[in-house]
Amino acid sequence: MKTKDLLFAIIPLVMAGCGLFKSADNLYKEAEIKRNGGEVQAALELLQRIVNQHTDHKKAPEAQYLIAEIYYRDMRDYSEAIKQYDKVKNNFPDSKQVPFSLFMQGFIFANMLADFKQAEIHYSKFIKKYPDHELYQSVEFELKYLGKEIKDIPALKHITS
């Protein structure tokens, strides 16, 4: 075998060993393991690889959504979470994560940032666009009691007692 042929046979094996050819599914699983182990930055990097390298894969919108969730839940970086949820809506407009992203943006604006105007905008978009969605009633509830204290919401009064 010629040296050139040998190199062409070895290079893909070396690259695969380095993780350059990992599937989107494997990267996603690895990201979940990293996140659950508290390595959120490593998880974000793996998820970003899915979004960048496997754009058309079914895991790409899930990866983008999980990036947003990590910023919201793990890092409590609400502004960045809102931006990442926007990427779900803009880059994967037909994915099932879009309504959840819109809901989460409204939720963050209302409950974390106390920006009730933006919350109302996002929740109203949800109501118009997704009248049959499983979160529809939750959005109606959020809109109805937007800006109110828990003690002022009859259905939740028992929580503060």
Feature names for model-found ranges:
Residues 1-7:
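Bacterial N-terminal signal peptides that target proteins for export
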